[in-house]
Amino acid sequence: PADANGDISRSSTNVDEDISQFAVDNNFQADFATGDISHTVLLGLDHQRTDTSYLAIFGDGGTTNIFNPVYGQPIVRPARSTAFYDYNQKTVQTGLYVQDQMALDNWRLTLGGREDWVHQGTTYFNKNDATNTDRSKNFSGNAALSYVFDSGFVPYLSYAESFQPASNASVDPLQSFKPTEGKQWELGIKYQPPGSNTLLSAAVYDLTQKNVQVTSFQSGGASVTDQTGEVKVKGLELEAVSDVTENLKIIAAYTLAKSEVQKGEFKGNRLQLMPNQQASLWNDYTWHTGALDGFGIGFGARYTGNTYGDQANTWAGKANAYTVFDGAVHYDLGRLDNSLKGASVKVNATNLFNKDYISTCDGSYCYFGDQRSVVASATYQW
C-alpha cells in the first residue's frame, strides 16, 4: 500500500514459458454378445511426451507516487542467475486402457480400467543444473450402472478413479511433486421425454483428491507452487437442453460445489479458486423460413460465485461473484445458394458489454477478468 505521502513500491515480473507436446492414441473396438448380454469393448494404448521450459524472474519495479505518477521509468531486468524458477521438465506418459459396455434388457453396466506409466525428469538451471527424476505407475478403474425406463428416465450410479502427473516443478530440486489422484462417486438421473428433443439431468457427486497443486505468493510478487494433502468436493449439478420450438434452443446449467481441505495446514478451508456456485444460460433462435431463413442469433449469461485465491481464505484473497453476458450471430450460407450447402459463418462475442470485474485475488494482488472478445469463424461440413 501507499504511504502517507502517496509513495508506493512496485515489483517487476518476467515470465517466459514454452510448452511442446506430442500425443498419439490408438484404440480398437469390438461389438459382440455372450448369450443375452451385448458387449462393446474398447481396448487402447496412448502415449504422450511433454517438454516444458519455464523461467520466472521477480525484481524491484521502483517507486512512484499515486498522486503524481511518473510514467516510463526504466526498470532494470534482473539477471537470469537470480531467477526464482528456471527449469526444463520432460514428461513421458504411456497408458493402456480397456472398457466393456454391457447391456441386458434395460440394464446398462460399464466396467473399465487403465494402467499408467510415467517418467518425469526436471533440470534446474538456477540450482547449478541440479536434476530430479521420478518414475510412477498407477491403476485407475471406473464402473457405472444404469437402468433405461421406457418412460425416458435413466437413473445411474458411477464410480471413477483419476491419475494426473504433476505439470509443474517444485522450488526445491530435492522434492518432486506427486501425481494428483482422485476418486469420485456420482448418483444421478436423466430424463428425455419420448419423442422430444429435451434432455434434463440432475446429479450429486462426492470427489476426493490428494496431492492437489496450489499456488501461494511471497513478498515481491513471487508465486510458489505447492501441493495440499487432500481435498474433498461435494456438489450438485443440474442441466437442461431443449429444442423448445423448431426455432428456439435453450441450454441451462447450474453447479453447487462445497469444497474443503481435509489434510494439511489449511484443513477446513475452501479449495483455492473453487467457486461455490456456477450457472449459465444460453438461448439460440434460428429462422428457417422467410427473408431471414438461415440466420440465427444467440444470447446468454454466465454466473461465477465467489472464490478464494489464497489457501488461508483471507479477506484480501476473496473475489466476489460476477455475471457476464455473451452473444452470437450465425448464418447458414447454404440457404443463400445451394452450391454453398454445408458452409456457414459465425461471430461469437464473450463479455458482450465489456464489463470490468475482478476474476481472482491471491491475497497480494487482484486480477481483472477477460475483456470483450469477438471471434469470427467460417466452417464447412461435408
Language-model-detected regions and their locations in the chain:
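Residues on the lipid-exposed face of transmembrane beta-strands in outer-membrane beta-barrel proteins
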Residues: 24-30, 96-102, 143-147, 187-191, ...
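Residues that define the transmembrane beta-barrel architecture of outer-membrane proteins
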Residues: 18-22, 90-94, 135-139, 181-185, ...
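Short loop/turn motifs that connect adjacent beta-strands in outer-membrane beta-barrel proteins
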Residues: 32-41, 106, 150-152, 194-197, ...
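Membrane-embedded beta-barrel scaffold of Gram-negative outer-membrane proteins
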Residues: 155, 179-243, 250-255, 259-262
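Gram-negative outer-membrane beta-barrel transporters
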Residues: 106, 206, 226-311, 356, ...
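Structural signature of Gram-negative outer-membrane beta-barrels, strongest in the C-terminal barrel
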Residues: 19, 35-42, 46-48, 87-209, ...
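Conserved C-terminal beta-signal and adjacent last beta-strands/turns
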Residues: 40-41, 157, 185, 272-382
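Surface-exposed loop/turn segments flanking beta-strands in extracellular/periplasmic regions
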Residues: 2-8, 54-85, 131-132, 183, ...
